[in-house]
Structure formats: structure tokens, C-alpha cells
């Protein structure tokens, strides 16, 4: 299962979803989908922009967890 760790990364920085939306220019609804892991697909440009703004690597934002 692919996981998006946006909620953890924002929490570590004490940022809101609105903060990230403003700083990236990504629609708040899209940020919310990523935050709540509702996105069935991700836009790689969005992931790149989020990593740039958060100062993180893609591997810190997205990971694969094996179902047990």
C-alpha cells in the first residue's frame, strides 16, 4: 500500500493544510486529499513542489507499506 505522510510532516512543522496550500499554490482541496490519503493518484509536480517547500525528500513524503 502506498502511503502519503503529509499529515506527519505538517505536524512536525506545526503547519496547517492552508499554510501548505498558500506556499505551494496547490488547491486546498487537493492538499486535503493528500493529507487524508484520499488521493487515488498523485501529481508528480505537486509532490515535487511539496517536497521543495517542506525541505524534504520524496521518500519522506511517500512510502510503501507492506500489508501483513
Locations of regions flagged by a protein language model:
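Short, charged recognition helix plus adjacent turn
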Residues: 8, 33, 52, 62-68
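Residues within the helices of the helix-turn-helix
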Residues: 7, 18, 48
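DNA major-groove recognition helix of helix-turn-helix/homeodomain DNA-binding modules
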Residues: 45-60
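The alpha-helix within a helix-turn-helix
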Residues: 10, 21, 51
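Recognition helix of helix-turn-helix/homeodomain-like DNA-binding domains
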Residues: 26-41
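Residue-level detection of the helix-turn-helix DNA-binding "recognition helix"
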Residues: 11, 25, 36, 66
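A short, Lys/Arg-rich alpha-helix, primarily the initiator
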Residues: 1-15
